[in-house]
Amino acid sequence: MESNSKISLVGLGNMGTALGHALLKDQKQLTIWNRTASRPSVTSLVDAGAVFEPDLSWTISNSPVTIICVLDYPTIRQILYPIVNSHALKSKTIINLTNGTPREAREMKEWMRHAIFDGGTIATPDMVATPASSIFISGENEQRFSSVTNIIEVWGRAQYVGQDPGAAALNDLALLAGMYGMFAGAITAMALLKKQKSGSREHSGVESQVTGMLNPWLQALLPYHAKMAESIDRGIFESLGNPIQMQSIGMQNILKACDEEGVDAGSLRYFAGLMEKVVAERSGEGGIAEVVTLLLK
Ligand code: FVH
């Protein structure tokens, strides 16, 4: 079991800063490094008790565990590769919370060669250390993961998702894909609502319609996701009472209405094309989850 009272933190952007403040509140001794020392977040962490170290090697050598939270993997490679064989990293554990692809995480394990966990943070900086926050972790093994769980749990619910270094990134990006898909549809809906003619409810504003109608509708649909996922697991795409042929006509009506009302529905158009392809190539009596067969390469 590693002693986790001393932690180093590399990268003090919005996310790194939130992670750092949560660690300080948990009474950790924190050594911090950031490319730009003059960033106000550096001052805020030093004021809260962190020690700023201008040298990256010293920062890492100061604690058994170092958290990395920078912009992207090319940045990690740029700052860490030059010191990867130095004494500073010997016997250290790295927890990388930088967003990236599964392949980038696997490649990092290759060139890093030290103990490294890769993480996906399912939280915005404001959510860190609240019940809404959870963190996927992968790499090494579950036993070694248990030696760093007490750090991860400072920020949110810790979920170990496997030894494959890329597993956390895959889970993280899958959730974000769901989020951006939802945003794409929701923002198209908001644009359409914005086009309401005077005399209708546009004076109440888009926000009240989103709160009063769109959000309850999306919330009511969440169990449908689980039913679609079950179809995907079984490879049998029942209609679930809503055959894709019927849904495809509804989708075409959305695209047509957007054209008529002056809304760009491009973010839905590609998906509508996939639905049409399923209808054209299959019976059209199955469910919308059958689209997944066109996505899997
Ligand atoms: N913020 C969010 O909502 C999400 C929540 C989920 C996780 N993401 C990922 O976390 C990584 C860091 O995100 P961030 O929000 O902290 O990002 P920024 O505020 O833009 O800070 C970027 C830090 O990266 C440093 N940096 C950038 N380029 C370099 C470089 N060439 N060399 C050294 N450091 C670099 C930057 O340093 P500086 O500009 O202050 O000198 C910041 O410390 C990210 O992967 C998210 O996807 C956030």
Model-found features: residue ranges?
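NAD(P)+-binding Rossmann beta1-loop-alpha1 motif at the extreme N-terminus of oxidoreductases
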Residues: 1-68, 92, 154-160, 191, ...
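Hydrophobic beta-strand scaffold residues
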Residues: 30, 52, 116-117, 265
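A general structural signal for well-ordered alpha-helical segments in protein cores
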Residues: 42, 63, 73-76, 105, ...
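Rossmann-like NAD(P)(H) cofactor-binding subdomain of soluble oxidoreductases
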Residues: 56-68, 72-135
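Rossmann-fold dinucleotide-binding core
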Residues: 99-180
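Helical "substrate-binding/catalytic lid" subdomain
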Residues: 167-264, 270, 274-295
